[in-house]
Amino acid sequence: MEKNHNPNTWSELPLDLLNLVFKRLSLVNFQRAKSVCSTRYSVSRQCVPERQIALLILFPKEDNTDNSTCKLFNPDEKDKLYKMQDLGVEFAKSVCRATYGSWLLMQDSKYHLYILNIFTRKRINLPPVESQLGMVKIERTIYDWFHFSHGHYSFSLSSPVFWIDEESKDYIVMWGLGVYCVVYAKKGDTSWNQIPQTSYFYDMVYKDHKLYFLSSTGTFQILDFSEEMDNKTSKVVCLLDRKLVVTVTGKALKVAKMWRPTYRTWSFRVFKISSSGYEKLDSLGDEALLLDLGITVLASDVEGFKRNSIYFSCRPSGGYETNASDLFLFNLETQKMELLHKFDCSSLQLYRSRWFLPSLTHT
């Protein structure tokens, strides 16, 4: 008896079955499966894999002929690197300054800023950095230098952070304007808005529509952007070699990173920030800390992640790196540093690398 093969039946699987399959796919297979047909793309928008995935993005060298590509590393698949293509001719000449979900905040050599979705290639251009609303005025001069209203200074775009809604594409981008203040721009803005009383910027994290701000003079603020600005300010003690981190539940932490030359290893101390000062924490519990992103995640929700650990990469800092092409985790329970992965790439490539947590619902 002759069998009737219909080549189109594979795209007509029940939606409930497709939904179950999509929830069990890895990141790369998820992206591949949703591009098969319109039906599968529609299903992909309604579900995400059961576990969050953390990826490290490796940028191409500037002189690479294939400079519109990048590579993705998944710690759960240590022997694989996935290649992303057609990211634009400016991609290799731009630097990633921050990540949120599947989006990258990119800066080119002339300080032009834009947001790029690594999977959909959607690009959003941001206002010129010299377009400022506030007391500090900036003028772009010849050769793309900048002149400040208080005189000539080297331009500093410090520790930018951002948030974007995957569906509406509403966004807010913030960065430190040298020692002067923090500035921000939302969707529809044509200029950067300067935030008063945010001078001597040191570090900041944006989470749940709140900006956690730490100054070099010891001032800690929480600025609420969900409504009109409701500034909450408390004084804290400042230490060197620190990083501001916000936990899953919204608690503010200060993470101190220390180099031990005798053992040629890094060590960390974690402190909870409160109105009375710092409280040392001996454990992150079931959470893992991504130092580059300034956040914690539930380790059980991220493939390949270990609880109570700090994930970090070596970056040039006074020549103290063990190997600038290595990726590490620090276990707070054992107080030991573990080599997570050794990359076959240049120190500059790893220095430019960034962790990101892709959002798979609307990409």
UniProtKB/Swiss-Prot annotation:
InterPro entries: F-box_BR-signaling, F-box_dom, KIB1-4_b-propeller. It holds the Pfam family F-box. Residues 7-56 form the F-box domain. PANTHER family: F-BOX FAMILY PROTEIN-LIKE PROTEIN, OS07G0183000 PROTEIN-RELATED. This is Probable F-box protein At4g22165.
